[in-house]
């Protein structure tokens, strides 16, 4: 049976009120041509409408491409995601209560697909406890329109767990590279597998239809079965991209690179250096927590500088990982975020989060935006600015050793190091250490329950988490504790009896 269909025929499979699962990580494995087609169909006909959309990672280019191209009031009734990827139309809909919006951890959503594939009704996990995902706080609800409880607190053998509901998926919209006439899908040009296979299996187990966007159609005789990632039994319709350079990009920044596809390694890519500024100071202090051979996850922003500092310090054998499923190699940032070059392996995203949730990471280096006196951290929402947690909650609740990296203030901070002292030239306008934060993405209380080792590194000092909260353990040379640390905080912390100076070598250009 030839499953190759036109775009319009594929969209006809989507009915009003369907629950749709979308694959993708930014634009990697994102079926953008189909998403654009759905948006155009709705604008022209008013259908399909009332959809419930699930996605794991943020899907788009953080501007004007991706799920935002089908984010219209009426088209999407409910939106469940780990990250909004700066989807401004959807954020506006959420703020106006024109959509029921939920924000759950990326690993949890990827595991919902796998649970559905096995016809299991729930994902039971400790991920999300005591964060905004916990029903004792917000239950993952982004707005007032989100009335239904999709997560429940339960106890098993007197231990707390969260029970996330597994929906019945009607439609899966995923992406591969090549299809044969039976619908067998290979992914040789994609940056990684991400959640395409898990979504296909979840949808078929639910009795739904799976639509796959590809670049190529070939005869089954020409496909090596070892290359097939999604068997044709999971596929109902195959749509060939008519404009692959526009709609079938490996990443927002790259149409196609064989190195990003993992076809061979290249010495052209290297971990780039970082100019001497606050980021480099923080990264240099952070790598003091790093050991050779460590398996690591780096968050976006300042933590990305950790890999550069490690190379500079001669720590070259750390194993970097990416939430999308890549292990080893050099993770890429910016418009290629979520991909890597010279990676050792590519796992399905759900399997990567199995590894994370099991405590497989030796260290995680992540950013912070707001922190309260208890040590709770917010990175997911700031008033009307809705970002999402991504994989932050999965990682910070599962990694034994966590290093939070960030400046004391933001929006205008300038420093220099002279005469052996760190000098604050101008303070940032935005305080990060606040009496109250907008929501809890990292729970210090849960961290203590999990017996994690947590420190927080800034350009001017270091805090450690202990059973009583935060304690100041290190200060940069030249920094006045009262005016330049506590003076830019809404609260005070305890000061260690063994307070020490940060190593002066950290500040050498």
Where are the model-predicted features located?
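Conserved phosphate- and dinucleotide-binding cores of soluble alpha/beta proteins
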Residues: 3-12, 26-44, 54, 60-70, ...
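Glycine-rich phosphate/diphosphate-binding loops that line cofactor/substrate pockets in enzymes
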Residues: 6-19, 167, 285-295
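Generic N-terminal amphipathic, Lys/Arg-enriched alpha-helix
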Residues: 14-21, 262-272
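Nucleotide donor/acceptor-binding cores
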Residues: 18, 47-51, 77, 293-294
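Short glycine-rich or small-residue beta-strand-to-loop segments that form or flank ligand, phosphate
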Residues: 19-24, 52-55
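Glycine-rich phosphate/ribose-binding loops and adjacent secondary-structure elements
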Residues: 49, 272-276, 280-291, 295, ...
């Amino acid at each position: 049976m030839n499953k190759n269909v036109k775009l319009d025929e594929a969209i006809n499979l989507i009915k009003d009120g369907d629950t749709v699962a979308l694959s993708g990580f930014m634009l990697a494995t994102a079926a953008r041509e189909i998403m654009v087609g759905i948006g155009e169909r709705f604008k022209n006909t008013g259908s399909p409408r009332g959809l419930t959309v699930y996605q794991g990672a943020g899907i788009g280019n953080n501007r004007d491409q991706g799920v935002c191209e089908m984010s219209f009031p009426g088209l999407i009734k409910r939106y469940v995601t780990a990250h909004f990827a700066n989807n401004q139309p959807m954020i506006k809909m959420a703020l106006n209560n024109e959509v029921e919006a939920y924000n759950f951890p990326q690993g949890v959503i990827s595991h919902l697909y796998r649970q559905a594939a096995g016809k299991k009704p729930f994902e039971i996990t400790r991920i999300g406890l005591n964060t905004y995902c916990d029903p004792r706080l917000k239950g993952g609800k982004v707005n007032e329109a989100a009335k239904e409880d999709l997560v429940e607190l339960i106890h098993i053998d007197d231990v707390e767990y969260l029970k996330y509901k597994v929906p019945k998926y009607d439609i899966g919209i995923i992406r591969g590279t090549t299809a044969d006439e039976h619908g067998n899908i290979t992914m040789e040009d994609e940056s990684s597998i991400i959640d395409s296979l898990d979504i296909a299996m979840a949808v078929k187990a639910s009795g739904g239809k799976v639509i796959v966007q590809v670049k190529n159609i070939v005869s089954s005789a020409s496909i090596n079965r070892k290359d097939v990632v999604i068997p044709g039994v999971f596929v109902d319709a195959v749509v060939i991209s008519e404009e692959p350079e526009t709609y079938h990009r490996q990443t927002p920044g790259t149409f196609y690179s064989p190195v990003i596809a993992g076809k061979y390694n290249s010495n052209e890519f290297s971990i780039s250096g970082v100019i001497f500024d606050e980021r480099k100071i923080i990264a240099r202090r952070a790598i003091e927590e790093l050991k050779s051979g460590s398996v690591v996850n780096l968050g976006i922003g300042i933590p990305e500088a950790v890999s550069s500092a490690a190379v500079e310090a001669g720590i070259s054998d750390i194993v970097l990982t990416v939430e999308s499923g890549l292990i080893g190699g050099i993770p890429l940032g910016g418009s290629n975020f979520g991909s890597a070059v010279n990676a050792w392996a590519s796992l399905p995203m759900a399997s990567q989060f199995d590894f994370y949730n099991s405590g497989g990471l030796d260290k995680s280096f992540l950013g912070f935006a707001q922190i309260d006196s208890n040590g709770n951290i917010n990175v997911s929402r700031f008033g009307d600015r809705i970002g999402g947690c991504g994989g932050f909650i999965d990682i910070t609740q599962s990694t034994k050793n966590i290093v939070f990296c960030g400046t004391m203030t933001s929006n205008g901070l300038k420093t220099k190091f002279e005469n052996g002292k760190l000098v604050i030239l101008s303070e940032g306008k935005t305080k990060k250490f606040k009496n109250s934060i907008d929501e809890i993405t990292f729970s210090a209380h849960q961290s203590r329950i999990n017996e994690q080792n947590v420190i927080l590194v800034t350009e001017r000092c270091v805090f450690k988490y202990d059973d009583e909260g935060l304690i100041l353990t290190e200060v940069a040379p030249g920094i006045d504790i009262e005016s330049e640390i506590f003076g830019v905080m809404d609260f005070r912390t305890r000061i260690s009896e063994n307070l020490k100076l940060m190593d002066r070598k950290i500040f050498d250009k």
